[in-house]
Amino acid sequence: MESLKDIRDNIKSVQSTQQVMVTMKMISSARIKKAQNAMLNARPFSLGLEGVIDDLRKDILDENNSFKDPDLSKFFKKPDMEKKNIGVLFITADKGLAGAFNALLLRAALNFIKENQDKNIYFFIIGKKGRDFLSRLKQPNVHIVYDAVGIFPKVGYVHADILGEEIINNFLKLDLCEVRVLYNDFKSMGSQKLENQRLIPFDFEIAQGHTEFGEEEHGFLFEPGKEMIFKLLLYRHIKAGLYRILLESQAAELAARMNAMDSASKNAGEIIDTLKVKLNKVRQSSITNEITEIVGAVEALNK
C-alpha cells in the first residue's frame, strides 16, 4: 500500500501538470481570437484579386486561347499525371500537445507517398513535426526542397511571400505536374478538417463576377503591359492563397491545442479527485490501525 507521503506527492505532481495545461489553454484561447481576425481579414483581398485576374486573363488570351508567355499557361492547364514529378506543400505544427492535429497529417503524408511510389515527390514543409517525420523516412523518391519552422503562431504575409516564391520557382523549374497542399483547415473551435487540395495549376477557371470592372471596356492603360501585370497579380494571388492557408492552419492548431488542454485538464482533475479519495482511505486506515494498537496496548496493561 502506498504511504500518505507518496499519495500527497502524486497529488502535487498532477496539480502542477494541471496548472501547466490550464495555462496553455488560456494562451491558445487568447491567440486564437487574433488568428481568427487575421483569417477573416485576409479573405476579401484574395476574393477581390481573383476577380481582377479573371478580367485581365480574358483580355490577354490570344485567338488560340493561350498566353504569349508559356510559363503562364502552365498555371491553367490540367495536370499531366504522366509526368514523374509532383509537389506537396505539407503544413504541420512545430510542437505537440494538440490532440490528433499532427498525427492525422503525418498519416496523410505517408499514405500520399505510398500512393505515388512511381513519382518523385518534392515537399515544401512548414512545421518541425512534418520536417522531422519526412527526414526520418529516407524514401528515395521523397525530396525536401524547402522547409520553415517557428513561424507559428505569428504568421505574417512575409512567410507566404517567401513560400510562394519557392513553390512558383520550383513548379516551373522542376516541371511539376501539380502542387498539392496537405493541411488542417479551421472549421470551428471544435472542428478541424484535413484537406488535400490542388494548389496549382488551378482546379477550375478563376471565378468571374468578383470585381467591379465587369465586362465593359473602361479604357485602362497598363504599364509595363497587361501580360506583365497579369503575371504579377497571378503570383500575388497564389501568395494570398498561401497566406490564407497558413492562417487557417494556425487557427486550427490553436483550437486543437486548446481543446486538448481542456480535456487533459479535466482528466487531471478527475485523477486528483481519485487520489484524494485514496488519500482519505489510507489516512482513515492509518488512524484505525493506531487506535487498534492503542486499545490493544491498554488491554495488555490492564491484564
From Swiss-Prot:
Question: GO CC annotation: what is one?
Answer: proton-transporting ATP synthase complex
The places in or outside the cell where this protein is found are: Cell inner membrane
Q: Pfam families recorded for this chain? A: ATP-synt
CDD domains linked to this entry: F1-ATPase_gamma
Among InterPro entries, the record links this protein to: ATP_synth_F1_ATPase_gsu (IPR035968), ATP_synth_F1_gsu (IPR000131)
Q: How does it sit in the membrane?
A: Peripheral membrane protein
Keywords noted in UniProt? ATP synthesis, Cell inner membrane, Cell membrane, CF(1), Hydrogen ion transport, Ion transport, Membrane, Transport
Gene Ontology MF: a single term: ATP binding
| GO biological process entries | proton motive force-driven plasma membrane ATP synthesis
Q: Say yes or no: keyword Transport present.
A: yes
Q: Among its keywords, does the record have Nucleotide-binding? A: no
Quaternary form?
Answer: F-type ATPases have 2 components, CF(1) - the catalytic core - and CF(0) - the membrane proton channel. CF(1) has five subunits: alpha(3), beta(3), gamma(1), delta(1), epsilon(1). CF(0) has three main subunits: a, b and c.
Its biological purpose is as follows: Produces ATP from ADP in the presence of a proton gradient across the membrane. The gamma chain is believed to be important in regulating ATPase activity and the flow of protons through the CF(0) complex.
Family, similarity comment: Belongs to the ATPase gamma chain family.
Protein name as it appears in the record: ATP synthase gamma chain
- Organism phylogeny: Bacteria, Pseudomonadati, Elusimicrobiota, Elusimicrobia, Elusimicrobiales
